From Swiss-Prot:
It comes from Cereibacter sphaeroides (strain KD131 / KCTC 12085) (Rhodobacter sphaeroides). CDD domains: RPI_A. This is Ribose-5-phosphate isomerase A. Belongs to the ribose 5-phosphate isomerase family. Homodimer. It comes from the Bacteria. InterPro entries: NagB/RpiA_transferase-like, Ribose5P_isomerase_typA_subgr, Ribose5P_isomerase_type_A. GO terms for biological process: D-ribose metabolic process; pentose-phosphate shunt, non-oxidative branch. One of its GO terms (cellular component) is cytosol.
């Protein structure tokens, strides 16, 4: 077991641990993708193992599916589950209205499909992910490989009429080749610095031929759980306006840390 977690990993663990407390027996769950979501999967597996919690998980990526299966969580497809009680996922950024940028892990398409097929979406994040305005993190846009350069030009043209501070568009690479999503598509990263009207931008991007989906999640997230490096955690619900503060006992994490290889 590692001697001590870094403050950022402590924050991610704290958020994940608190969010998993929302899971009830018999639920069908959307399992997010990314480093914070991986903590959530481990925390969920601990409850399955120690409490006999019965859940079905719908992963949002191949790597999440592999982790969930390895830890003993029952994995099903969204077609098998049909509808979900709860999705727990991370975010690259979120604002005061719980609008999100997601897709840093290149799983934005499945993440958005799963989140919108859920009664509730809970986002888990460290405090650094909260921003006044979206856009400092590059906005991912998933595009069809065929004619991607033409699609890129249309995106750049669309950005000319948008309230953004930057307009650079780059193809995401894996080594020297384009990164491929689980659906074998490409990712274009939009370096916008600040997005003034995220709803308008999201709608405009999805009207472009060749665009599959974009990483703006608008009116999808219901609850945000924010972790801090000292183990503090806050839960905020958009609909009720309520906020809860708490503290995660890091000593309880020993059996989770034990299965970490790095």
């Amino acid at each position: 077991m590692p001697a001590e977690l870094s403050p950022i990993d402590t924050a991610k663990f704290a958020a994940a641990r608190r969010a998993v407390d929302l899971v009830q027996d018999g639920m069908k769950l959307g399992l997010g993708t990314g480093s914070t979501a991986a903590w959530m999967v481990r925390c969920l597996a601990e409850r399955v193992r120690e409490e006999g919690l019965r859940v079905q998980g719908v992963p949002t990526s191949t790597r999440t599916a592999e982790l969930a299966r390895a830890l003993g969580i029952q994995v099903v497809t969204l077609d098998e589950a049909k509808w979900l009680d709860l999705t727990i996922d991370g975010a690259d950024e979120f604002d005061a209205d719980f609008n999100l940028i997601k897709g840093g892990g290149a799983a934005l398409l499945q993440e958005k499909i799963v989140a919108t097929a859920s009664d509730r979406m809970v986002v888990i994040a460290d405090a650094a992910k909260e921003v006044a305005h979206l856009g400092a993190f590059p906005l991912p846009v998933e595009v069809i490989p065929f004619g991607w350069q033409s699609t890129k030009m249309l995106i750049e043209e669309t950005l000319e009429g948008m309230d953004v501070l930057g307009r650079e568009v780059t193809l995401r690479l894996s080594g020297d080749a384009p990164l491929l999503t689980d659906e074998k598509n490409y990712i274009l990263d939009l370096h916008l610095k600040r997005i003034g009207e995220p709803r308008k931008l999201g709608l405009a991007l999805n009207q472009i031929a060749g665009v599959v989906e974009n990483g703006l999640f608008i009116d999808i997230c219901d609850t945000v759980v924010v972790g801090h490096g000292d183990g503090r955690v806050s839960l905020r619900d958009l609909q009720s306006g309520q906020a809860e503060e708490g503290f995660i006992d890091m000593d309880r994490a020993r059996n989770i840390f034990a299965d970490l290889g790095d």
